[in-house]
Amino acid sequence: MVSRIGIYGGTFDPIHNGHLRVVVELLSRKIVDSIILIPAGQPRLRSEAPVADGKARLEMCKLAIQDLPTGIREQVSVSDIEINRNGPTYAIDTILELNRQEAELFWVIGSDAYSNIDHWHRASELKELVSFIVIDRPGSDDESALDIDALDISATRVRQDQELNGVSPSVRKFILERKLYASK
């Protein structure tokens, strides 16, 4: 049987409960068999660089997994594939590196990012290699997106210290101990 792997890339600056809700929903509904979280190295289409460095964002993803329910956390892993890549981060390069014959790959993406997919590097090739699971943003009316009761949490608001309750306990502790985002 072919394994269905969800590739969930993002800046994760920081990873928050909205991201984790998507993970739990995809796995508990058996839409995918496992998920790989991939913090972006240098996202090409972002206007600003991530605030936290790659190692901190990678660690926050690992910590967030520990706070997931038993039975879910075992199906989630974190990859440093993009953090360790020099230069801009492109989804196609990640998929080509992760491509496995015994697996069907699904790129998990927000509806806002998916609306710009044709601007991605080698987008047509990417579309041939993966299926997309499009996640609706709160307040969006995108009918093509998967119906997940998404949480209205923003990494920007977390960084501005407005919603530290929007991250998992282990991630909150990490942010506070390292004083991440404190000056923002």
Can you describe what each PLM-predicted range is?
Residues 1-184:
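Nucleotidyltransferase catalytic core that binds NTPs
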